[in-house]
Amino acid sequence: MKIQTRHRQPLRILCVDDNVELVELVAEGLQFYGYRVEWASDGAAALQAIAPHPEKFDLLITDMEMPFLDGHDLVVKARAAGFRGKVIVFAGALSPKDRERFGGLSVEAIIDKPANHRQLIGVVARLQTELWEQSNADAA
């Protein structure tokens, strides 16, 4: 008997970018594909959304350069607060040094802006499949 898990539900995604028009566009695109999406316009606001209930989101999609708290520090603090979800860094032309900074943070993908929506949706769909498979293995 298979057990229904929460990952058979649409992914719960938090998108973070200080470019409000872009983050709204990304959120709307993900919602079109059935994902449940919230967004924040800076790292500090995102951390406020994550910290009280770190299990609320399955996926964090973050920019790198943002006011108050950059993408790297957001991931560090989110992990420290108990966030165990997947992470995609969606940022403009990261330097090799910035890419290296994300190396030890269990980041599933780094996508350079500008990217077409198919690339982002493809990575999100792959991560959802991984979560489904992991949930099924855990339930077995």
Which stretches of residues belong to each language-model region?
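Non-catalytic signal-transmission and effector/linker regions of two-component phosphorelay proteins
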Residues: M1-L14, E24-A27, N116-A140
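Conserved phosphotransfer cores of two-component systems
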Residues: A51-E55, K77-R84, L105
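A Lys-centered signature of the CheY-like receiver
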Residues: D112-K113
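Acidic, metal-coordinating helix/loop segments flanking the phosphotransfer/catalytic sites
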Residues: W39-L59
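Receiver (REC) domain active-site loop signature in two-component systems and cognate sites
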Residues: M66
